[in-house]
Amino acid sequence: MNKEAYIQMFKDTDALLEGHFLLSSGKHSAKYLQCAKVLQYPNLAEMICRDLAEYFKDQQIDVVIGPALGAVTLSYELARQLNCRSIFAEREDGIMKLRRGFKIEEGEKVLVVEDVITTGGSVKEIIEIVKEYKGEIVAVAGIVDRSGGKVGLGYPLKTLLTLNIETYEPDECPLCGEGIPIVKPGSRKVK
């Protein structure tokens, strides 16, 4: 599928929201991509992950890992497409870690996934976990890179959509200046 088709998919599932949003990164934005609204449809999740899997089918990935909650479905379906394991990391006392008996064996080839990448904060936390376990990171994958390709993660990044959606520091946000109420739609508590 092309970029326009993916954008239309977000619109058709009411996953492209407009307003005033507090992102997990702590930044503000006039647009929010709620991937869960797309991924709630198994046929769309399968289609998205099939397209992503094409980039990694010859990489012999051993495990796909992403942060809970946003990347759990993405990690699972992408791992199914790549015929490998899927695990996720989650926060415990504010720190991202592997729980539930999940582990990465030394030398395993790992694909890190996230649904939407803005600053790469959650992805960087996952990368650190993989390094702790001495896994070999092959790449980072996602549905949307909303940084416009500006986020640097130190590994190849492959997303289906690269959008340049403006974000603002809270003290520089024009939406705050206009008095527009802010909404926090994500899954991570912002400090």
From Swiss-Prot:
Keywords: Glycosyltransferase, Magnesium, Pyrimidine biosynthesis, Transferase. One of its GO terms (biological process) is pyrimidine nucleobase biosynthetic process. It is an enzyme of class 2 (transferase). It catalyses: orotidine 5'-phosphate + diphosphate = orotate + 5-phospho-alpha-D-ribose 1-diphosphate. Coiled coil: none annotated. Orotate binds at residues 118, 146. CDD domains: PRTases_typeI (cd06223). Disulfide bonds: none annotated. Its cofactor is Mg(2+). InterPro entries: OPRT (IPR023031), Orotate_PRibTrfase_bac (IPR006273), PRibTrfase_dom (IPR000836), PRTase-like (IPR029057). GO terms for molecular function: magnesium ion binding; orotate phosphoribosyltransferase activity. It comes from the Bacteria. 5-phospho-alpha-D-ribose 1-diphosphate binds at residues 114-122. Its EC number is 2.4.2.10. Pathway: Pyrimidine metabolism; UMP biosynthesis via de novo pathway; UMP from orotate: step 1/2. It holds the Pfam family Pribosyltran. Homodimer. Belongs to the purine/pyrimidine phosphoribosyltransferase family. PyrE subfamily. Catalyzes the transfer of a ribosyl phosphate group from 5-phosphoribose 1-diphosphate to orotate, leading to the formation of orotidine monophosphate (OMP). This is Orotate phosphoribosyltransferase.
